Amino acid sequence: MILIAFLLSYGFGNESLLSQLYPGRVVMPKPVYDEIDRPALAWMKARVDSMINAGKLTVVELTSGTDEFDLYYKLTVNPDEGHKIIGDGEASSIALAKVKNGIVASNNFNDIFTYINEYSLEYTTTADILVDAYKKGIIDENQGNTVWANMLRKRRKLGAVNFSDYLSTHS
């Protein structure tokens, strides 16, 4: 199971790289879905809704009384001493990943790195997904550079000036 926090991988055409790389394994916690339901993110919500309607993404509710809800509550309202409260999207992704043995997909490690380590969670980033797509022949290096440049224009932090540079050190 791949869990999306604030990471929605760019695709080519109408296909998402996530759904191509991880068919049937892409889920979005309901709190994340709720966070993208605003005018400034209408483009992202439209893409998510398209993936949902095509059966390529499932939105998962956190139900009161479940282990994942209890952890979500702890992370958003009453964290352990020395830990900070994190946002609903990050917390729901971490809670589901911990309970369901999923992978957290996020570029926002400032808030969640402590929890990723503490719970020994597997995680991935946009950069990792692009490398995986490249290795599997879903995208070529030029397409990776295009996605990378688009994300940098949106002020995303990716760890290299372009995909080619990242690829040279991570493949």
For each feature predicted by the language model, list its residue ranges.
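Short beta-strand scaffold positions
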Residues: 106-107
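Positions that flank functional sites
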Residues: 110-113, 131
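Active-site-proximal, substrate-binding regions of enzyme catalytic domains
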Residues: 1-96, 100-102, 113, 142-150, ...
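Short Asp/Glu-rich motifs
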Residues: 38, 115-117, 135
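Long, charge-dense
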Residues: 126-139
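Glycine-centered loop/turn motif at secondary-structure junctions
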Residues: 101, 119-120, 137
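Short, electropositive alpha-helical surface patch
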Residues: 116-123, 160-162
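Short hydrophobic/aromatic-enriched beta-strand-loop microsegments
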Residues: 26, 121-129
